[in-house]
Amino acid sequence: MKSRNGPLRVGIGGPVGSGKTALTEKLCKAMRDDYSVAVVTNDIYTTEDAEALVRMQALPSDRIVGVETGGCPHTAIREDATINLQAIAGLNQRIPDLDVVFIESGGDNLAATFSPDLADITIYVISVCQGEEIPRKGGPGITRSDLLVINKKDLAPYVGADLEVKDRDATRMRASRPFVFSDMKRGDGVSSIVSFLREQGGL
């Protein structure tokens, strides 16, 4: 069901340890039976995330490409996305029927954003463990991503995080933009994210 405009490109960003790779894995497994899916991962000096997705059997290895960004990973998704665009072009050439390509950024900060030339839809992932105040700190990832995922909700009692406070702050900071609480370890929230991609991405 390939679009005339090419595959839907979904950018997945967030700080180190927030659960980006776990989310990418769950989305691939949830969507691969209905759609033709591929992944591009970004790491500074390795292709570790790509290798992890292969080990997790998220997709066949020929559908997963790891790029080494070197230096600052933010540049490869924003100011100069050439390396990622080339990786997507290579996937399109090898797999002409692609419906969705997930682009997982390297670990970044709250100011990181995806170039509109690279991603059609952006998902930003934060972890409950990173502090109760993270949603209200703002930054483009929090305020402007198409979907905010607040992950590891199951750990809230152990790190002293109040989910009601996070809910209130996310609602205030994002205005009408959607957000989801998730627990990727158990798969909680994945179906809501898939539904969002289907609706907003026209799948």
Curated annotation (Swiss-Prot):
InterPro entries: CobW/HypB/UreG_nucleotide-bd, P-loop_NTPase, UreG. It is found in: Cytoplasm. Pfam families: cobW. GO terms for cellular component: cytoplasm. Keywords: Chaperone, Cytoplasm, GTP-binding, Nickel insertion, Nucleotide-binding. Its main location: cytoplasm. It comes from the Bacteria. One of its GO terms (molecular function) is nickel cation binding. The keyword Repeat does not apply. GO terms for biological process: urea catabolic process. GTP binds at G14, P15, V16, G17, S18, G19, K20, T21. Homodimer. UreD, UreF and UreG form a complex that acts as a GTP-hydrolysis-dependent molecular chaperone, activating the urease apoprotein by helping to assemble the nickel containing metallocenter of UreC. The UreE protein probably delivers the nickel. PANTHER family: UREASE ACCESSORY PROTEIN G. Facilitates the functional incorporation of the urease nickel metallocenter. This process requires GTP hydrolysis, probably effectuated by UreG. Belongs to the SIMIBI class G3E GTPase family. UreG subfamily. This is Urease accessory protein UreG. It comes from Rhizobium leguminosarum bv. viciae. The lineage of its organism: Bacteria, Pseudomonadati, Pseudomonadota, Alphaproteobacteria, Hyphomicrobiales.
